[in-house]
Amino acid sequence: MTWGVSRRRLLTGAVGVLGASAAVLLAGCAPGAPEPVPSDDDVQAVVTVTVTDNRYEPAEVEIAPGQAVQWEFVGPNEHDVVAEDRGFVSELLVEGSYTHQFSEEGEYAYLCSIHPEMQGVVRVVAP
C-alpha cells in the first residue's frame, strides 16, 4: 500500500485550482454595465434617433449647443446608448426613451454596450 500522492492526481488538482482562480479573476475584471446617467426628460429634444433592429436611425445627427437629442427605443431587443466618454448613458431598454442635452460643442461618439457594432455620433456645432 502506498500513501504518496500520484503525479497525475497532483497535476489534475493543480489545473482545477488554477482554472477556478482564473475564472474568479476574469469575472472581477469584467467591465459590467456602465452606470446610467439620468435622462434630461424636462428638455424638449430637437432631434429624435430611433433605436431598433440593432441600429440607430439616423446614426449621425447635428445640433447646436444647448439643444437635446432623444433616443426612442422601439424594440424588439434590449439596447442602450453609451457615450464614449460616459457623459450620457441610458439604461438598457426595449421600449421607452432617453434624452440628453448637449451644452458644449464637439463630436460625441456613442454605442450600445451589448451590441458594440451599433454606433452613432452627435455633432454639436455652433450656428
Predicted regions: what they are:
Residues 2-127:
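Extracytoplasmic copper-binding redox domains, predominantly the cupredoxin/blue-copper superfamily
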